């Protein structure tokens, strides 16, 4: 029984390390408020959240997506790998949406620390930061599935 617990502990450490390593390979980490139930999210789901096609979590709480400033390397990588467009193309899309009166883009934070603080204080928030950004209590990373 004790060896099974030891094996499970080792496995948990390996899986956690692999999850963080894969996030670092991406260059960004998706973060949510600790009160959020989310443990993993697909790139398709992220796309819908950040393009505001999904506006509520399954709990009914409003989704509040927050982007990094447009000149951030993590934002460019997020835009390319999740949205499938460059940051400039995403901004052009949102300008068209705003002009036509169909919506507004996610809030844009000036720094990674601002994203972390916003997500920590906003229960329905989801954001992303570079993989090297330290996370604080009240915020946790979620695994991104392809």
Explain the meaning of each model-derived region.
Residues 1-5:
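Positively charged n-region of N-terminal signal peptides that target proteins for export
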Residues 18-23:
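Sec/Tat signal peptide C-region and signal peptidase I cleavage site
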């Amino acid at each position: 029984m004790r060896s099974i617990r030891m094996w499970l502990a080792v496995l948990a450490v390996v899986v956690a390390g692999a999850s963080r390593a894969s996030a670092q390979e991406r260059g960004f980490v998706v973060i949510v408020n600790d009160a959020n139930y989310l443990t993993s999210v697909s790139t398709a789901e992220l796309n819908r959240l950040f393009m505001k096609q999904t506006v509520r979590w399954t709990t009914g709480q409003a989704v509040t997506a927050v982007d990094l400033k447009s000149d951030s390397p993590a934002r460019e990588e997020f835009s390319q790998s999740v949205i499938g467009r460059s940051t400039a193309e995403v901004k052009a899309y949102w300008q068209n949406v705003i002009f036509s009166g169909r919506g507004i883009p996610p809030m844009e934070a000036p720094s990674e620390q601002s994203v972390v603080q916003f997500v920590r204080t906003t229960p329905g928030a989801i954001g992303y930061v570079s993989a090297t950004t330290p996370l604080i209590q009240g915020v946790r990373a979620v695994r991104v599935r392809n």
